[in-house]
Amino acid sequence: MTSQELTEQILKKQSFLCVGLDTDLDKIPTYLLSEKDPVFSFNKAIIDATHQYCVAYKPNIAFYEAIGVDGWKALKKTIEYLHAEYPDLYTIADAKRGDIGNTSRMYAKAFFEDLGFDSITVAPYMGKDSVEPFLEFTNKHTILLALTSNEGAFDFQTLKTGDKELYKKVIETSKNWQNSENLMYVVGATKAEYLAEIRKIIPENFLLVPGVGAQGGSLEEVCKYGMTKNVGLLINSSRKIIYASDSSNFAEIAGAKAEAMQNQMASELEKL
């Protein structure tokens, strides 16, 4: 899916919501544990209840890796289900990969070719040659970690390197790489005050923004400083939606939470 196609979906649905599928066997309703594939059963129920209110889904790969082969099978089934039933929805592999070139090339093949994700999160710390293998897939997006939502972001990401903070250096350097139009960036909602400066560097690229909801980030602040004329935002919400309830009607309640966020987003889109 191209950035233009993603924007079209956002305007059509009046939503730039991304639902994070951080599926944890310790948190899903206990009755699902008797299912043959409880992770997929949970994901399917969440997707069916929320798809009309969002434009993207973001499985956090660690939650699937943690349960071994069964987790990978559930992840693949989830993506295949999305492709079959809701092909207009954008998919993000929240994998935070990044390694020397030949290793990154294998990561790219795994997530783009085998699993068929539209995009993947990548840690850019090892530099250009660790990111290029992902950018070689010109029909996919590479989402670089720029300024993350966790408290530890201040340990390194805001340190000055020369006359600029490290996160700014990452953004400024990467925008000159090949196929940089296929780059997106992770900027946490808890760092909304930095968005105006970031938009001076990358006025058009999409930003994936975690931290609205459970981490306390403000949707209004993110939109105020980060939204572009083409929207340019994907706001992720995971726990606030998927774990809104552990009762038998968990999916219905998740759908209501997603709808509430979609309504807020529609109000923000009216300001464009």
Curated annotation (Swiss-Prot):
The keyword Lyase applies. Keywords: Decarboxylase, Lyase, Pyrimidine biosynthesis. One of its GO terms (molecular function) is orotidine-5'-phosphate decarboxylase activity. Gene3D superfamilies: Aldolase class I (3.20.20.70). It catalyses: orotidine 5'-phosphate + H(+) = UMP + CO2. Its EC number is 4.1.1.23. Pathway: Pyrimidine metabolism; UMP biosynthesis via de novo pathway; UMP from orotate: step 2/2. It comes from the Bacteria. The active site is at residue 96. It is an enzyme of class 4 (lyase). One of its GO terms (biological process) is 'de novo' pyrimidine nucleobase biosynthetic process. Belongs to the OMP decarboxylase family. Type 2 subfamily. PANTHER family: OROTIDINE 5'-PHOSPHATE DECARBOXYLASE. HAMAP family: OMPdecase_type2. This is Orotidine 5'-phosphate decarboxylase. It comes from Christiangramia forsetii (strain DSM 17595 / CGMCC 1.15422 / KT0803) (Gramella forsetii).
